[in-house]
Amino acid sequence: MIDDAAPPYVGRFAPSPSGPLHFGSLVAAVGSFLDARAHHGQWRLRIEDVDTPRTVPGAAQDILATLERFGFEWDGKPVWQSARLDAYRDAFERLRAAGQVFPCACTRREMADSALARDGSRLYPGTCRNGLPPGRSAHAWRVRAHGRIAFADRIQGPQEEDLATEVGDYVVLRGDGQFAYQLAVVVDDAAAGVTDIVRGADLLGSTGRQIHLQHLLGYPTPAYAHLPVVVNTAGEKLSKQTLAAPVAALPPARALFAALTFLGQNPPPALGRASLRETWKWAVTHWSLVDVPRQLQAEAPGAFSARARENPSSL
């Protein structure tokens, strides 16, 4: 049921152009798109190319073409993070003026023996929190992490995180001058008026930091829903690094049917022989977030876990 008193729904899909879309990317796109359309809301598209060393030339255009081929329709023009550096700089300067960030001289080697944070990274020990050591220059700028962050994930349920002990002071401006993902995504979501974020559970560990930044910058906090991450038969997340096959080579209607099945929507077998248009129509009408499996990851069905250069012959 849609709450008429709630603000207009604005969702988004924000792929990184580090390679072509794979089945895991498709699942995230399908989940966010259907939740937006089922709420009669907007679905925005953002290309997260702020991390220029990871950006592959031509990948963004390939992503846009694949989404169009699969029948996705987004609202407004795609937003490119590389065109929004001034907005990130303004947000960073606000944090610095408020004393919420500090320069850090620590290298990865110096932090190698630190305790592990919740997401598997090294927990920052606070070495530079009260000033740089004599003779050292800043390699990055970090946010002073403090307090507990709690939120109700629409799929994964109640979440709580102590920033100081489970995350530590986190980077918002890197030594190479690149703004960190956490800052860029928060600024972009606020600028677009995003009310609901539906994405993979691999980003669940980033949510506490993003809510923290929203509080510091005076931004509203969207509702969050984290879908199970798609993994291959070895239990690895589908990605460029694990040689996930591009979905562009797959029949769109069959791939969409598989994504709906993965998301617990229980599409009828006859839909597997329907056209792409008919499949989308059924999916929007029957979308149910409560039926999405409440788990952090699940294996891709059959040939959809195939590696690049393998032939998905079962399709």
Curated annotation (Swiss-Prot):
A motif ('HIGH' region) lies at residues 15-25. Its EC number is 6.1.1.-. Keywords: Aminoacyl-tRNA synthetase, ATP-binding, Ligase, Metal-binding, Nucleotide-binding, Zinc. A motif ('KMSKS' region) lies at residues 237-241. The keyword Metal-binding applies. Zn(2+) binds at residues 104, 106, 124, 128. L-glutamate binds at residues 12-16, 48, 181, 199. ATP binds at residue 240. Belongs to the class-I aminoacyl-tRNA synthetase family. GluQ subfamily. HAMAP family: Glu_Q_tRNA_synth (MF_01428). This is Glutamyl-Q tRNA(Asp) synthetase.
